[in-house]
């Protein structure tokens, strides 16, 4: 039996702290689940319906979905593979319905580029203003340092913003976030001041 989103969020009250608030960076997908559940409570509809209406439809992301079962019906979908014992092996899709806000969006490079455009174009897609510029600034603003040691000579120590990692490469701000699930990896990376994204 899988717990519902509400049950998972309510159980977080029993999660023991491993560090005080804002003392140590700790990435936790359950917080994305919590944010998704809050969207459901405030909008009186599922997280999926809210994302579809507020993001996917305005961005013309018609093939993007929340279920691997839907993805499998698409004429052009990717299959998950795992490199094991020196060979590529096809593995089953992993469906994460109850924790969908933490990583169940299935998309394509073409459709994800529309999401990137919004972040590089001051919140606009075509003629439609989806986010006000100050909201984008808030999303990309570092709130929590991750480390004090730079990973490379040309990259600053990273921080975490609102759903984005932020660092500086040779003085250029980089805003990025990856996602992984069995057989798949993805990365969205932006250089907002330069207007580049992939």
Provide a role label for each language-model segment.
Residues 198:
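Active-site periphery "cap/insert" segments of enzyme catalytic domains
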Residues 1-182, 187:
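Short, surface-exposed loop or secondary-structure junction motifs
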């Amino acid at each position: 039996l899988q717990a519902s989103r509400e049950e998972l969020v309510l159980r977080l009250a029993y999660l023991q702290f491993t560090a005080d608030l804002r003392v140590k960076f700790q990435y936790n997908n359950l917080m994305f689940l919590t944010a998704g559940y809050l969207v459901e409570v405030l909008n009186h509809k599922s997280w999926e319906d809210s994302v579809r209406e507020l993001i996917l439809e305005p961005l013309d992301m018609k093939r993007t979905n929340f279920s691997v079962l839907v993805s499998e019906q698409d004429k052009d979908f990717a299959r998950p593979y795992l490199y094991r014992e020196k060979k590529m092996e096809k593995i089953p899709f992993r469906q994460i319905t109850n924790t969908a806000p933490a990583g169940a969006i299935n998309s394509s490079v073409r459709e994800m580029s529309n999401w990137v455009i919004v972040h590089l174009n001051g919140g606009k897609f075509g003629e439609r203003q989806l986010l006000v510029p100050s909201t984008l600034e808030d999303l990309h603003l570092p709130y929590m340092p991750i480390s004090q040691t730079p990973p490379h000579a040309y990259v600053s120590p990273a921080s975490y913003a609102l759903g984005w990692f932020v660092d500086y490469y040779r003085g250029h701000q980089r805003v990025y976030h990856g996602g992984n699930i069995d057989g798949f990896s993805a990365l969205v990376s932006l250089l907002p001041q330069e207007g580049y994204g992939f």
